[in-house]
Amino acid sequence: MSGTPRRPASGADSFHKPEPEIVGPGTPGFPEQEEDDLHRTLGVERFEEILQEAGSRGGEELGRSYGEEDFEYHRQSSHHIHHPLSTHLPPDARRRKTPQGQVRKPRRRPGATPAGETPTIEEGEEDEDETSEAEGPVSHTDPSPASTPTSVQFFLQEDEGTDRKAERTSPSPPAQLPHQEAAPQATKKAQPDALVEEAIMVSGGTAGGDDGGASGRPLSKAQPGHRSYNLQERRRIGSMTGVEQALLPRVPTDESEAQTLATADLDLMKSHRFEDVPGVRRHLVRKNAKGSSQSSREGREPGPTPRTRPRAPHKPHEVFVELNELLLDKNQEPQWRETARWIKFEEDVEEETERWGKPHVASLSFRSLLELRRTLAHGAVLLDLDQQTLPGVAHQVVEQMVISDQIKAEDRANVLRALLLKHSHPSDEKEFSFPRNISAGSLGSLLGHHHTQGAESDPHVTEPLIGGVPETRLEVERERELPPPAPPAGITRSKSKHELKLLEKIPENAEATVVLVGCVEFLSRPTMAFVRLREAVELDAVLEVPVPVRFLFLLLGPSSANMDYHEIGRSISTLMSDKQFHEAAYLADEREDLLTAINAFLDCSVVLPPSEVQGEELLRSVAHFQRQMLKKREEQGRLLPPGVGLEPKSAQEKAFLQMVEAVGAVEDDDPLRRTGRPFGGLIRDVKRRYPHYLSDFRDALDPQCLAAVIFIYFAALSPAITFGGLLGEKTHDLIGVSELIMSTALQGVTFCLLGAQPLLVIGFSGPLLVFEEAFYSFCRSNELEYLVGRVWIGFWLVLSALLMVALEGSFLVRFGSRFTQEIFAFLISLIFIYETFYKLVKIFQEHPLHGCLASNSSEADGGKNTTWTEAAPTPGHGNTSSAEQAGVERPQGQPNTALLSLVLMAGTFFIAFFLRKFKNSRFFPGRIRRVIGDFGVPIAILIMVLVDYSIQDTYTQKLSVPSGFSVTAPEKRGWIINPLGEEEPFPVWMMVASLLPAILVFILIFMETQITTLIISKKERMLQKGSGFHLDLLLIVAMGGICALFGLLWLAAATVRSVTHANALTVMSKAVAPGDKPKIQEVKEQRVTGLLVALLVGLSLVIGDLLRQIPLAVLFGIFLYMGVTSLNGIQFYERLHLLLMPPKHHPDVMYVKKVRTMRMHLFKALQLLCLALLWAVMSTAASLAFPFILILTVPLRMVVLTRIFTEREMKCLDANEAEPVFDEREGVDEYNEMPMPV
């Protein structure tokens, strides 16, 4: 911009006439003196010089093009320095004021710069320059005594005429004021290009007056009700200055001066002030740690010191967004009403019912996003605003709107009044207490924001904002230094239930964003402001919950504007709830950073065509496309080169990123990684897990662990009773409930004390039951002692485990793919279902249904006598167990026994299955549903036992449980088994041949234990103390081998019970956004729960009398329940359903979308072939070898299937996509997580 001042239209247009009534007495000839001063200051000769200089420039300078030589000349010349227009006014009109009693410090000059380079200044110095320009323009001419007046008077006092007359008549030099005498004389002569000498404040009289030495004398005598002139007014434009207070303004106002300028001149001024022309730049600014200069210019008013406060570190937080719209209440009074909120997803307030709707993904119109970007590009952006209250923020926002010409000066009061209206929320009317949402304006006035002594209750409304009254800005500045006033008694209240419930869903340390949008008719065009506070503060009566506010967005405008304010408010709210955008908003230094973040958001947005959607199925591709866009967004964020995007700006952020990179570079401690040394994996397990041994007991001091003990006890006792009862049936009571309970207790206690992963639950499982049945059949057919053979199997079992651990063979579990696991799980489920109906059919054969006979009394009695003679039945025989009738043949042909057994079996199954479904239903609160669903099996057993107990005249076979600490059949065996034989010597060849069944048992234990440990140790579960594959395997197998000496069972890690145990000890974050999946906060990794569960299971022998009341038909129902529920989550079972579906109804899963249907059916056919082969082996005398056939499916998958299917098809058909299940989705629970048998 040229340094030539613009020509005003006329003196009458540019200056205000003095008020004659203010002229003090004793000042005759005052108008003539004033006229002389005007002619001397800005005479006609001066304007002619200005016009000649402007004419010499003419249009040729405006129309010419600049080259590199001009740019170089610009850098080397004084034109490179920014001069405001006021610097070209007469010297006496642009003096800089200095309060009395202070001395102008010499200007500190930066170091010399090499020739030809643009001097670089520090950011703080640039702020100092801007503050100096704001407070008063400076002159770059050398001051001289002849041309520099002694004082500058901005406002005339009553005795100004007398002072001026004295200055005219007296030839003596002007009197020195006290602060001038203290200044060294050499300072005025040094540095010819320094700032002008300090201006002298008018003291109302001569220097030698009565109060000439007073330092606090104001510039003018303030009239009653007015405040004195303050430098803060320099922030306003000239047309807003209180000119009515001045008798003789020396500087024309902006409006009157702008009327005399041509359009080209105005454009040139705007270009110089606001644009950044390449090649013609100002001084380079070196960023330092003092903070952003923009925050000084836009965020807050300049204080008394030119230095800005250091910028507070902006660490991104989680956000809570609230959308408030300006609406009318039932009394037709305007108020801010909450219409939507965002924690992660959008929740809208339903207009009719005033309640919150369901959370959903916000759908935005593309036009609203474009309008939002346009308003942000041209609106007011205040970053790092240093305010603590809503009125203070509102004042700053309104001032910035006036300065940026978004609103007129006369609209200031209306906009401010609108910002301070009452805020209402949907939960307010539900509270039966004192309303908390009091108007911020009135409440702020009552609590001391305006300390006026008048009777006005609302200064914002009743008092003018400019002139005539004390300005609120001074009060806001004073308020910063005072502690916040305490609210009156009766206003504060405790948090309501609604607030507490909502606060649980908001993440900890979250900061809020308040969005205010609405229509106001007093504005002629929309106005916008985006505010980021320096520090998050709680604004009273604004949000529905006490969350500190960091961001505010304001959009007001007339209804005639072609703009949907509601949609723009939803757009900025959705942007602030987006993770990437709100991080960019925290780290933004200027407006361009926000615009760049909006563009990045638009790049990943999906636009739907304006076509009618008939059903939700048509929108499936949208979700898939959105996931692809998000994946691409994440990849681009990882691939950004240094210097691109939002880089860390502080040392703390850089150090944090370096730490994250260092942690990511460290190789994960894979427990299955081989060391190459004998027992190397076992040693690593011990070193990894045992240092946390003491913490495993300290971490159990939590109420959640006690609840987990009760739940897991019933979860472990039910299978022990079920499998024990079935084992007693299979082995003729050689091993039954008593032995299984003792095995579970002893091995469970030992494993919880010494194991590496105490979250595993040791128990009996379906595959081991199948093996025990097969081995018992083998021994019985070959006339071998079953229990003695188990002792030698246990011996070889321990040797096999030692060899496997020494060779670090646990890594072989990685080769067991989903192909093998699903065949294994499906086989065990089929066996469970088959055995249930086989037992039920057997009951119907033993107790057939009786036909209806004419004379059924005698025949029935005869039949009754022939079948019950040895049983000696009593009226209470229905409640006796088979153990009490040892050695007595069980009754045969009992009436109604088969029907009652069917009812008990079906009832147990359906109750347990229904309660499992009820857990994820929508009835009752979630906590009640989970308790009922988790205890579904014990509840089903209890209900059916009560049903059976109530029917006394019908016989049912009961569970065989001994009294006290005893084996199931004391007449057949004892607690210690002789390895050489009980009744006869055990064959030596069988001692050696027991190695083969030992290997088969080891395969089963290895697969179940290691796969269960893999599932528990998934990264998604966020376990911190690690696992130990080698140590756990050695402990479980060794304990099983030793227990065989006592006739007890070997156990394995039970998959379903272990996953249930881990889920019960998982602490989920309560701060879960509505509609979002729960996140794991921590897992209570400790040993106490498993230890207590094992002890309680062992003590269950004390309740033998209660266990003897359980009918076997009830256990068959639990057996059926385990078989059916194990099918969930098996893709093989789900793909069988696709055979009966047309392709258009196939689910939208990976193995359907990426693999052709015929190829998918071919893979399924191969699995069916392997399953049929295993079933055939199980049905023959070679059923003992079924684990060997099962393990052959591993090389089949690795060698044969890879030649039939492509690598991509195998990844889709044999991928392990199961993830930990923690949320409550209908039909989904822990059974869907694992393709393993129960």
From Swiss-Prot:
Cytoplasmic-side positions: 1-704, 916-930
Catalytically driven reaction(s): hydrogencarbonate(in) + chloride(out) = hydrogencarbonate(out) + chloride(in)
Membrane-spanning ranges: 705-728, 734-771, 791-813, 823-844, 898-915, 931-951, 985-1007, 1033-1054, 1088-1133, 1160-1196
Topology relative to the membrane: Multi-pass membrane protein
GO molecular function ontology, one term from the record: chloride:bicarbonate antiporter activity
Skewed-composition ranges (Gly residues): 205-215
UniProt xrefs under NCBIfam families: ae
Protein name stated in the entry: Anion exchange protein 2
Species whose genome carries this gene: Cavia porcellus
Protein's gene: SLC4A2
